[in-house]
Amino acid sequence: MSYVPALKKHYKDNIIKELVSEFQYKSIMQAPKIEKIIVSMGVGDAVKNKKLLDSAVYELSQITGQRAVKTKAKKAIAGFKIRQGQEIGAKVTLRGNIMYEFLYKLINLALPRVKDFRGVNGNAFDGNGNYSFGIAEQIIFSEIDYDKIERISGLNVTIVTTALNDREGKALLSKFGMPFSN
């Protein structure tokens, strides 16, 4: 038998049953699940300093446990001196067991380390049950060594679910233990 992350086991054993009874689904297959988690980091100064972009890719890889890819500008923005196709950020798309491990680490280890943390905004859903929020400092993750980073920068986390609406999405993430402030 292979390794199953604790959150995945908790989802299959408990959360599905709770969601089916709460939303009166006819089948357990209707219960929403987390499809993927996208962690991204924009590096605006990468135009001037390529080392910052490599540092961002390395840090995202350390945080998530999966290799990050560089993202390119979709269009030119003269005000920011950005040309189309220029590398300006990094992202990681997590699925499967790595996704559940990252979510556990985020909810139980990283978010409680945020100074004056009172929960994440519960209204940041997109209308389709997907949830996005920002983290101001990457140093809340224990994998990042404060002495070795180029600069403190934030990152964005998007949790994509199969929920049909925001109410189902919020219920799903709440049962996983996401600390919503409202």
From Swiss-Prot:
SUPFAM superfamilies: RL5-like
GO biological process: translation
GO cellular component assignments: ribonucleoprotein complex; ribosome
Top-level taxonomic group: Bacteria
Keywords for this protein: Ribonucleoprotein, Ribosomal protein, RNA-binding, rRNA-binding, tRNA-binding
One Gene Ontology molecular-function label: structural constituent of ribosome
Pfam families: Ribosomal_L5, Ribosomal_L5_C
PANTHER family documented for this protein: 60S RIBOSOMAL PROTEIN L11-RELATED
Function as written in the Swiss-Prot or TrEMBL entry: This is one of the proteins that bind and probably mediate the attachment of the 5S RNA into the large ribosomal subunit, where it forms part of the central protuberance. In the 70S ribosome it contacts protein S13 of the 30S subunit (bridge B1b), connecting the 2 subunits; this bridge is implicated in subunit movement. Contacts the P site tRNA; the 5S rRNA and some of its associated proteins might help stabilize positioning of ribosome-bound tRNAs.
NCBIfam families associated with the record: PRK00010.1 (NF000585)
Assembly notes: Part of the 50S ribosomal subunit; part of the 5S rRNA/L5/L18/L25 subcomplex. Contacts the 5S rRNA and the P site tRNA. Forms a bridge to the 30S subunit in the 70S ribosome.
Family: Belongs to the universal ribosomal protein uL5 family.
Protein name: Large ribosomal subunit protein uL5
Species assigned in the record: Borrelia turicatae (strain 91E135)
Gene name, Swiss-Prot/TrEMBL: rplE
